[in-house]
Amino acid sequence: LRDSLITRARNKLVAEFLKQKEYTHLFFIDADIVFEPQQFIRVLLYEQPLTCASYPIKHESPIEKGDASFGWCMNFPLGKYDLADNDKGFKTVNYAGTGFMCIERKVFEQILKKYPTIKYKTDVRANIDNEREAVAVLGNEEYAFFDCGIQGQGVLEDKENTQRYLSEDYFFCALWKQCDGEIWCDLTSTLKHIGIKEYT
């Protein structure tokens, strides 16, 4: 899939996924994530609707230069960042990056049921080379599961009045949490994130 906007690309993939009624899980794996097969299996088979694994932010520690990252693409509940919630090594987190995330069909269905206004129609050719195919996709229905937004505006709630700006992956996590969902992160599968170097 070629698209200049990551938000639109993710939404397009979800729309195609939802058209295939026999599909049960959508697993996002970004091209810059390095993982082992067993890490994929752990996240896929964990019995929760939304699961993921942690990977480092592409940012060096200002104290120790090297391959070690300064942070992780996830956000823990305040004061609960040290231990997994169970002996399988998974923990609930506030938000997580979508670069290595497994999502059951019912997650999208529940969000769409609560927020039907996120539906929109495509207005781009989606980089399709064939003119006839390009015209055919114009006006297709897609859904803004992945968008950027400010908490307290649009469909985003803001109970703590933070007015925080959310990236597209945190936006999606916020929608799912507003449906009483949880984000379960595998803390034992430490992935690598490729940038100007391989961050660990």
Mark where each language-model region is:
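C-terminal catalytic/acceptor-binding lobe
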Residues: 115-200
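Active-site-proximal specificity loops/subdomain of glycosyltransferases
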Residues: 1-24
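Short, Asp-centered acidic motifs that coordinate Mg2+ and/or phosphate
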Residues: 25, 49-50, 183
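Short beta-strand-to-loop acidic/aromatic patch adjacent to the donor-nucleotide binding site
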Residues: 22-34
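A generic structural signal for residues located within well-ordered alpha-helices
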Residues: 9, 98, 167-168
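Conserved catalytic core of nucleotide-sugar-dependent glycosyltransferases
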Residues: 14, 36-154
